[in-house]
């Protein structure tokens, strides 16, 4: 009876929370794209807003990388209704129906619903009106011609601050028929992958390297039964010129449905790509697809939620919106990017001097910085988003061979060497690696004061994988080679370096000498950094690899003003006179054992010493 009462109480609380889940509603239109509302599903994101009576949205699809590794938007879409219900409307309402995963806009008897299919890359726009109205549909593209990459614009791609003179973004192709528009970006034969491979001395193994940019085509098709192509025109939005392909209703109607199907794939020809797109189109069934998408979103919210009233209501709101945007990339082949995910908007509304295209995002599109990516993915363990973590795990798994080839070519030993700022093809970002390097520099090491020897961040994702087994009893067998290779790198590489310095590859206690190394990006030329040791100890213990664990040094301690605490690095007798030589980019590396690798990394360190560590 007690168990039954608890069950009833749980069901009641669950019902109340579900019932209390609010829609996020606006009662006035927006001024520009910075006031847009997220909408999406699967691996598709839309920024939706109403401006001067027009319904607009950007479309982003995960994996749409161009030749320079910019993550491209698929275009901007504009819907203009006549007579216009949204101009000077007294009953304007725009809602993110978060529980069902769609956006609804209404005024003066007109309702527009936008939703993305969770299980296939298809967007639906459904327009309902009490009276017959006309509709204009604009497909707007700013890549209608080759675009010279301007000052600061390199931050959106892998060149960053070192954009070669004359570098362009190649134009898109746009093909119009009577009632449809086909649009796509096709990467040229040479991409940033080829440039990076040559820069980093890997041309002899180029054909063995995973290359996600080769023959990549991204785009889609928009169509509707009641549309007919009208004309093109040019304009400027948010400081960026564009060309619009404009369709109009054949006749006024009370109901209009517009569909956009997307496709991103590596195809040797445009015809093969279009075949893949048409396969998706052939599977569309709007009624059943919508039901299945709503079922998915309902289950997504029912399995995990935070709902708080009172002073913390804003915290609850922000958490829910952030989680919704994470859910929009749940079925992606690529991780949700830390710098905006699928939902960036025109940069001029962040910084008025950045009159750059909607494709712009600082910190790149195809460059993944591990210390930032981890912040997106660690919390998913607590919220039970194990399926959402898969794209991040698969990201590293796909890059494993490339990381292992780096070790084999540069140092002739085994193990996966993953950089901190990692390209989507598994090599260090070329600008961080260094365009102007002395001939004597080790080709496997970034010539970079912040990132040299910063190799331990991949271990955080290894531990995330291991934690999914602890949290969810997940089958992680496919990732075991990745994890084992990541830890084996440190064993192989630091024995290799020790033998370059002298006869012995271990210290007097039979431990690895982790020098030169880096305690996060902060303490450079460190010996036995706390962050790396904690990572190795935690992962090896979770993995059950005691044979390698015994070679890992203890987490270093130091005493300051009579108080013992965790040290960034260890002071031992090696060729470096102290445990560190320089300090860069301030991060609390000594807190990594406290906060990130909490299960095993500092089990033998007393609580008082942990508390003294700042």
Give names to the regions the model predicted.
Residues 20-435, 533, 541, 548-613:
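Aromatic-residue-lined binding/catalytic grooves and analogous aromatic/hydrophobic interfacial grooves
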Residues 4-5, 128, 472:
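Intrinsic-disorder/low-complexity regions
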Residues 266, 338, 343-366, 418-480, ...:
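The feature captures the catalytic groove of carbohydrate-active enzymes
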Residues 1-20:
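Bacterial Sec-dependent N-terminal signal peptides
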Residues 3, 323-324, 374-378, 449-467, ...:
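Contiguous, well-ordered alpha-helical segments that form the cores/surfaces of helical PPI scaffolds
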Residues 110-112, 117-122, 131, 143-145, ...:
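A conserved hydrophobic secondary-structure block that centers on an alpha-helix together
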